[in-house]
Curated annotation (Swiss-Prot):
Keywords on record: Amino-acid biosynthesis, Isomerase, Methionine biosynthesis
The species this protein was found in: Solibacter usitatus (strain Ellin6076)
Function per UniProt: Catalyzes the interconversion of methylthioribose-1-phosphate (MTR-1-P) into methylthioribulose-1-phosphate (MTRu-1-P).
Lineage start: Bacteria, Pseudomonadati, Acidobacteriota, Terriglobia, Bryobacterales
Family: Belongs to the eIF-2B alpha/beta/delta subunits family. MtnA subfamily.
Name of the protein in its database record: Methylthioribose-1-phosphate isomerase
Length: 343
């Protein structure tokens, strides 16, 4: 399975997801500014992976910090990383975790602080892999044997520290002996499904068929799809789900055709401070992602473009939310809160 991100003595090493599937290349970030750029430019993407990258960004930032006004330097590091992408709550969760640890060590020798932050960032990474495997185990039973699973965007090993959330459920179902295959939406405009999900599943020899986003309803109506499993970037207290743009359309089609629609995400993706998805900030990305594909224009020059990176799926379309602590069902205000407080 692909290694998405790793801490090394030379810096934070991550696979360059903008180059896949044609080129498997790795980028080494040697300071926190380079980590921030990698997150913003989607060299690394996926909510859990962004969280791990942010933790490592704080750690590497403090490695290069001087003795003077360390508090101010840590604040700047955290603020820079927090400004990279607004929707994925895991980013802020990881930054807050690292900042709290730093706060608990304020006044200790700088080398001790540096060492402890590195260790914590590595713990965040290892925890994420273990969490993803637990999500997979909890979701495997929900996947119907002998059917096709539809997924949107990429919520696999590439979107996490390893194994994946939505693709982790698929992997776990196959490991349990189920005979399933996958339909992957191409996921315009950044093509995460075509470029990343198909490539990743091919690495594991999982049977995968690529379809365009506007084909999903056709195959659901034809009875080909057993269930839909997607990831999430932020989940509100009422169960509304922010995920890659186009997810809402898939969920509506699934409801219309009686296809179960599952969301696989770690507890860290829950944002119970938000009562509904209407409060989730939606990132707007550049027009060039829509007007160009691999650097080639596909629209007339000067075309007006809107490019929201995410949409919000209302909870009424969600059959279940699969976490490492179990599966939540409606009413989500109660079930999600119960999962969060579960030891």
């Amino acid at each position: 399975m692909v290694e998405t991100i790793e801490w090394t003595p030379g810096g934070v090493v991550m696979i360059d997801q903008t180059r896949l599937p044609l080129h498997e290349e790795y980028v080494t970030c040697r300071n926190y500014e380079e980590v921030a750029t990698a997150i913003r430019d989607m060299i690394i993407r996926g909510a859990p992976a962004i969280g791990v990258a942010a933790a490592m960004g704080v750690a590497i930032g403090v490695q290069h910090a001087g003795d003077g006004d360390l508090d101010g330097q840590v604040d700047l590091i955290c603020e820079t990383l927090a400004k990279t992408r607004p929707t994925a709550v895991n980013l802020f969760w990881a930054i807050d975790r690292m900042k709290r640890l730093y706060g608990s060590m304020r006044g200790r020798p700088l080398e001790e602080i540096r060492s402890r932050l590195i260790a914590e960032a590595q713990i965040v990474r290892e925890e994420d892999i273990a969490i993803n495997r637990a999500i997979g185990r909890n979701g495997a039973a929900l996947v119907p044997d002998g059917k096709t699973v539809l997924t949107h965007c990429n919520a696999g090993a590439l979107a996490t520290a390893g194994y994946g959330t939505a693709l982790g459920v698929i992997r776990a179902a196959i490991e349990s002996g189920k005979k399933i295959d996958v339909f992957a939406d191409e996921t315009r405009p950044f093509l995460q499904g075509a470029r990343l999900t198909v490539w990743e599943l091919q690495q594991d020899s999982i049977p995968t068929t690529l379809i365009t986003d506007n084909m999903a309803g056709h195959f659901m109506k034809a009875g080909r799809i057993g269930c839909v499993v997607v990831g999430a970037d932020r989940i509100a207290a009422n169960g509304d789900v922010a995920n890659k743009v186009g997810t809402y359309s898939v969920a509506v089609l699934a409801k219309e055709n009686g296809v179960p629609f599952y969301v696989a995400a770690p507890i860290s993706t829950l944002d119970l401070t938000l009562s509904s998805g209407e409060q989730i900030p939606i990132e707007e990305r550049s027009a060039a992602e829509v007007t160009h594909v691999f650097g080639h224009a596909v629209a007339p020059a000067g075309t007006a473009v809107k490019n929201p990176a995410f949409d919000v799926t209302p909870a009424r379309y969600v059959t279940g939310i699969i976490t490492e602590k179990g599966v939540a069902h409606a009413p989500y205000e109660e079930s999600l809160k119960k999962l969060v407080t579960t030891k």
